[in-house]
Amino acid sequence: YLVNPAGYAALGAYMFLLILIGSPVNFLTLYVTLEHKKLRTPLNYILLNLAVADLFMVLGGFTTTMYTSMHGYSVLGRLGCILEGFFATLGGEIALWSLVVLAIERWIVVCKPISNFRFTEDHAIMGLAFSWVMALACAVPPLVGWSRYIPEGMQCSCGVDYYTRAEGFNNESFVIYMFIVHFLIPLSVIFFCYGRLLCAVKEAAAAQQESETTQRPEKEVTRMVVIMVIAFLVCCLPNASVAWWIFCNQGSDFGPIFMTLPSFFAKSAAIYNPMIYICMNKQFRHCMI
């Protein structure tokens, strides 16, 4: 054991809790939306995509991590490590790029940079395809030799190798690519869209261009999406910051707990999206009841 066995027991219990909550709430989101036709709107397609991404993380990654935490090391071997790292990365990236699509949708609908534009089912499907292509562009390269998935922290979960400069894997170039293309760029797009959105909402309120009844539904949807983005940042920024620090300070003395806690905290992302959606979407709650 790299740390006290009680630490592994705590991680195992934490992962069990995430599975216990994450599986039913995400399945509930999928079931209720697919069961009720009035919930099958273009915007909800993207929210369904978030639920699918969360299920990838819960079923493909968390179950493996819980099992290895109970044993105190990567007991499933190289293949198990690769699968866990792949599903965790894929699910996290689908969620991030889905938030990008949601941000762009909110910007176009509220700010109207393109006159007479309606976000239709075709646009939603294009957004879904885009989020999957970008997520696969991040999760697949370590499977084929550009970087690799290795045990990290307390050795009971796996992720991209930003710890070493192992020969033949080009870890440095992949980590830089991942941070720029799959972290900084999507965050920049999200911040741009919500920056413009905030300005537009203030201008509309000041000029009273629209009635309160017209503005209210858009405000509620926008508020829900903004809270999802904030929750994502709270969960994932610590993990990304620690990963970048380790990458830039390879060889420095840092313990397994320092590497593990932000990573496991980020995994809670799999339960907050559906809970925000359920709590803040009145129409969904009515259909659920």
UniProtKB/Swiss-Prot annotation:
It is found in: Membrane; Cell projection, Cilium, Photoreceptor outer segment. InterPro entries: GPCR_opsins (IPR050125), GPCR_Rhodpsn (IPR000276), GPCR_Rhodpsn_7TM (IPR017452), Opsin (IPR001760), Retinal_BS (IPR027430), Rhodopsin (IPR000732). Pfam families: 7tm_1. Phosphorylated on some or all of the serine and threonine residues present in the C-terminal region. The modification N6-(retinylidene)lysine is found at residue 267. The record marks 84 as: Plays an important role in the conformation switch to the active conformation. Photoreceptor required for image-forming vision at low light intensity. While most salt water fish species use retinal as chromophore, most freshwater fish use 3-dehydroretinal, or a mixture of retinal and 3-dehydroretinal. Light-induced isomerization of 11-cis to all-trans retinal triggers a conformational change that activates signaling via G-proteins. Subsequent receptor phosphorylation mediates displacement of the bound G-protein alpha subunit by arrestin and terminates signaling. PANTHER family: OPSIN. This is Rhodopsin.
